[in-house]
Amino acid sequence: MLLEEVHAGDRLSGAAARGDVQEVRRLLHSELVHPDVLNRFGKTALQVMMFGSPTIALELLKQGASPNVQDASGTTPAHDAARTGFLDTLKVLVEHGADVNAPDGTGALPIHLAVREGHTSVVSFLATESDLHHRDATGLTPLELARGRGAQELMDILQRHTVAPL
């Protein structure tokens, strides 16, 4: 990787992590930095962005950022948005092709992470998009995970969307 590419990746990732929409736009449009350029840590701007800023996600995705880029542990931006509870950002990612059925390195789908963290609105959104029969590395479906946590509201949401396998 060229030093200037790393520098561009650091600048774009830094602006995305700070939530600096204007700088992200300037780098993408004026300096023509590729949205998937890697920073010095091997991450893209979409992977390190401020997840509370769906505008940043939208700008990067409109310019061609991959919504399904995985880090070394298999985590995608959708996993991060679900884990941290940023529903608006997650919706933008899904609208631009994020695969909510891609497991991370622990076998967890984004919905598993949302259940684990107790993000009701994220679980409700993902319940219609996710494979609710998928088991993580511990062998649990999202519903079983919610049951183990004693999270009745999450269990109710998941039960409404779970169809018995044939």
UniProtKB/Swiss-Prot annotation:
Pfam families: Ank (PF00023), Ank_2 (PF12796). GO terms for biological process: autophagic cell death; DNA synthesis involved in DNA repair; negative regulation of cell cycle G1/S phase transition; negative regulation of cell growth; negative regulation of cell population proliferation; negative regulation of intrinsic apoptotic signaling pathway in response to DNA damage; regulation of G1/S transition of mitotic cell cycle; response to retinoic acid. GO terms for molecular function: cyclin-dependent protein serine/threonine kinase inhibitor activity; protein kinase binding. ANK repeats lie at residues 41-69, 73-102, 106-135, 138-166. The modification N-acetylmethionine is found at residue 1. The keyword Cell cycle applies. It is found in: Nucleus; Cytoplasm. Its main location: nucleus. InterPro entries: Ank_Repeat/CDKN_Inhibitor, Ankyrin_rpt, Ankyrin_rpt-contain_sf. GO terms for cellular component: cyclin D2-CDK4 complex; cytosol; nucleoplasm; nucleus. Keywords: Acetylation, ANK repeat, Cell cycle, Cytoplasm, Nucleus, Repeat, Tumor suppressor. Belongs to the CDKN2 cyclin-dependent kinase inhibitor family. Interacts strongly with CDK4 and CDK6 and inhibits them. Interacts with CDK6. This is Cyclin-dependent kinase 4 inhibitor D. It comes from Bos taurus (Bovine).
